[in-house]
Amino acid sequence: CFRLGRNIMIDMGPDIFTQALQYGSMCDIEHVLITHTHDDHFDFTALGLMSMATHLRTTPVHFYFSEEGYRFIELLRDSEIAFGGTLRGMEKKGIYAFHKLKYFETYSIGEYEVTPIRGNHGGNMAKERSANYVLKAKDGTKMLYGMDTGLYEEETLDFMKNQNLDIWISECTFGNLKLQEEWNTHLCADTFLELLDTFEKNKTIRQDTKIYLSHINQCHTAPHEKLQGIMTDAKPEYQIVVAYDGLEIPISRDGK
């Protein structure tokens, strides 16, 4: 998961409680943007444990999904698998609220303008495609959070033209593994660099855009230092950082 300031988080994976122990309480979280419903991004079982801390807050936690991703919530509401069928009760008690977002429409969520864009990656629902998020802060700082991404289709690339991003956080799931052409729903180093070239041509990014690589599968990639070296050698003119657990990123234009 990626915490954005005090009260917004992107995704809620199965390691959220370990992260809370290591990096601080999650009780201030008010909004959770879900990219897609694979369980490494939305571990619905965590909802049951989070509901035990309701005495620490008086307002619901709001979860946001793509329209197809929201269908997963509709299934959970009527399933005994989800806490014995008590999810509706949690909603009625004001513990959680679930919302649908449309691709390429902008919403005011917390202190950000949030625009979901269509990724090229599936989810638990048959027609689901990931929602990547363009987030604009009050000071104008603009960031793209791209998990899981794959190679974007033309509709998304067209939307991202001239976005002039300050920050780009991208997956690089398969690291330096050479992917077969049909494996285009995740990125490796080569396909990430291909996407970077497209973003450069389309003025989606600038040379001073801060770029971070995450969602890296340790089973299919070089060690951290080697992957960092690959990126530095390939694009020395860009600020590409291979991320790690606990990394803090300045998200304002004054570097704070």
Model-found features: residue ranges?
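Cap/insert and terminal regions of metallo-dependent hydrolase folds
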Residues: 150-247
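Residue-level recognition of the N-termini of beta-strands and the immediately preceding loop/turn
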Residues: 29-30, 59-62, 91-96, 207-212
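Short, well-ordered amphipathic alpha-helices
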Residues: 17-19, 45-51, 73-81, 190-200
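Core dinuclear metal-dependent hydrolase active-site scaffold
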Residues: 1-23, 98-156, 247-256
